[in-house]
Curated annotation (Swiss-Prot):
The protein's name: Penaeidin-4a
Molecular functions per Gene Ontology: chitin binding
Cystine bridges: 42-56, 45-63, 57-64
Organism of this sequence: Penaeus vannamei
Signal sequence range: 1-19
């Protein structure tokens, strides 16, 4: 009896791993960079304080060069 229970468990686990039991079971890919809502100041690179430009550069990877 234990052998039957073990085999049923292994078979159901194999089906779940292959995606037959509940459809799509693969993990979703993670984004390469964290997704943040960017402040408007990062896109407008003139007329913003240098602290805002520095924050955008370090936090979002967008370096605003002030001219």
């Amino acid at each position: 009896m234990r052998l039957v229970v073990c085999l049923v468990f292994l078979a159901s686990f194999a089906l779940v791993c292959q995606g037959h039991s509940s459809g799509y079971t693969r993990p979703l890919p993670k984004p390469s960079r964290p997704i943040f809502i960017r402040p408007i100041g990062c896109d407008v690179c003139y007329g913003i304080p240098s602290s805002t430009a520095r924050l955008c550069c370090f936090r979002y990877g967008d370096c605003c060069h002030r001219g």
